[in-house]
A protein has these predicted regions:
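Core catalytic alpha/beta fold that binds nucleotide/phospho-ligands
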Residues: 1-149
Length: 149
């Protein structure tokens, strides 16, 4: 709401792209992404397409990488001292990238990577959070973490 007020818009107006990704009709020129897991929710706002994902670190099926991860990502997973945490880290980044694209999981996830944009991943208690901004926006310098419980 503060962002809308700064843009001179009383109430934000939201629309949906073809594949269901929400976007701001007003205030124009802003992008957002939402995610939740367990007791946390995450929101990302940017002037470029943006995606965010948060996932709780938990036991996972280590067979997932063969279907969804590139060979390079699978190698990182094999070499990791904490494969479940690394799997969640890679997965949240992939989710953030596909959310920013607006295409969702309709893409071959083995081909999804963050090399054409900016991203930041961090650990919050037992959760991994990844934010991805398309077009290599200045994410690293602008990201602000605000957590409330």
């Amino acid at each position: 709401m503060m962002m809308a007020a700064e843009e001179g818009v009383e109430t934000p107006e939201i629309g949906f792209y073809e594949y269901g990704k929400p976007y701001f009709i007003q205030p124009a020129g802003w992008y957002f992404s939402l995610s939740h897991s367990g007791e946390y929710a995450a929101c990302a706002l940017a002037r470029k397409p943006v995606g965010v994902d948060i996932q709780k670190i938990r036991p996972v099926d280590l067979g997932v990488p063969r279907r969804s991860f590139s060979e390079e990502e699978q190698q990182k997973l094999r070499l990791s001292n904490s494969p479940e945490e690394e799997l969640i880290r890679i997965w949240t980044l992939k989710e953030a990238v596909v959310k920013a694209s607006g295409l969702g999981l309709r893409q071959d996830l083995r081909c999804v990577n963050a090399s054409t944009g900016s991203y930041k991943t961090w650990k919050l208690e037992d959760y991994i959070v990844s934010v991805y901004c398309a077009d290599a926006c200045e994410l690293q310098d602008q990201i602000k973490r605000i957590f409330y419980k």
